[in-house]
Amino acid sequence: MYSRDLSKNIPIIQNYANQVQGLLNRYSDLASGKIELNFIEPEPYSDDEDYVNRYGVQGFPIDQEGSKVYFGLIASNTTDDIETVPFFDPSKAGTLEKQLTDIVYKLNRSKKPMIGFLSWVDTTPPMMPNNQLGQGEYTILEELSYFYDFEFLDTDVESFEGIDLLIVYHPSDISDKTEYAVEQFILNGGKSVIFVDPFFEKNDHSNKSSNLENVLKTLNINYNSNVILDGAQATRLQTQQNITDNTSLQTMLKLNWPEVRGQFINQAEEIGDGLSLIRLVSPGGLSPLNDESEISYTPIMSSSEVTMDLPMKEVHDPIKLINNFQPTGISYDFGVRLSGIAKSNFNDFEFKNDNHLEISSKNINVVVFSDADFIRNAFWARIQKFLDTNVIEATSDNGSLVTNVFDSMTGYDEFIDLRNKEAPFRPFVVVQ
């Protein structure tokens, strides 16, 4: 729906409307009759205006008389599922194709993949009116819930029936039985994403460090559980300093907060393709445990060689870190993808299952990150209000990285490039 006459004197809206309409027409042409378009121009106090308001499309006031421009979308499928764009924001033109493709994909997908979320931190999104995003600390999970079903699991779970993708988040106090269940799920072909962290910096969380020692050995991962300092990728923070009653801004290096960029993000791996900045918070270090393993180890993002590792208790004073920084020349990985044949590290476990697997039944598919903080809003998202709707402004690619992982692991990888590259004009390929 679009108020064409009222927007004639608003070039930015008019131009973007032409772009949106052109893209919708292109989608319809490619769909061979499976997408039907109806363009509505709501008049004040009309049935059309009541209809669009009922589904959340909002008018944008343009004068003191209360005239409103409508510029939104209501999409539905044959089972009456509804997706709505309250108002097309011209400042988001670079991601229009991704926005529309997400809607088409969601309405066309018969069943959402089930995400099993095994977390030692409260990541459950709050229940908000009108599905408002951005009220919790893990907005990325709120976003992903539009495309995936989530089951938040108890930390003492011992089986993962019906789970398409298992997330293990900051396992700070995992039992042997649960860790064994995670390993056997992976060896049996289950897909998993693991977040471990040497120093989880959330103030109200008592268990600061996490590990998954036995599973990581199964995955042929050597995990340095010290905090990795990176002198070449340190975050630069602006701080205020008072000197004789004059306040000045000073730049301070936060060595334990790497900003991973450029050559340190693997563009050849589809999860990292197109990403330009990942902000990490006191990460650990990953490397292969045994070079003779049958597991394929692919870095997603890495440190420089200007690094030093320190125990968690020694990284609280940023000035002290700078003064005592002595690079070792060792490079670490912060995120890796693993595939191939894995062998159990629980063959002598007292509580083995009757159908215990000593070797994986097929190639494993696992992603491991050595930081858990980076998916929290504070390190990638700024929440703003637009027409009474919370809008997420990304300040780094952390959210895209997490979404890429989910999409790649569950078969939605055809659309990863739409998220990572702001290119409104590109050749179209029909995805079967």
Sequence positions of predicted segments:
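Juxtamembrane amphipathic/hinge helix adjacent to a transmembrane helix
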Residues: T403-V431
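Short linear loop/turn motifs
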Residues: E65-Y70, N226-R236, K421-A423
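Alpha-helix boundary/capping detector
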Residues: D50, D63, Q241-I243, F428-V431
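Juxtamembrane extramembrane loops of integral membrane proteins
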Residues: M1-K106, S110-E179, E183, V391
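A short, polar/proline- and glycine-enriched secondary-structure boundary/capping micro-motif
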Residues: G94-E97, P311, F379-W380, F428-V429
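Generic structural motif
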Residues: R4, P42, T78-D80, P90, ...
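Acidic, S/T/G-rich, low-cysteine, solvent-exposed domains in lumenal/extracellular/periplasmic regions
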Residues: R109, P126-E414
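Generic, ordered loop/turn and secondary-structure boundary motif
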Residues: P86, S119, N224, M301, ...
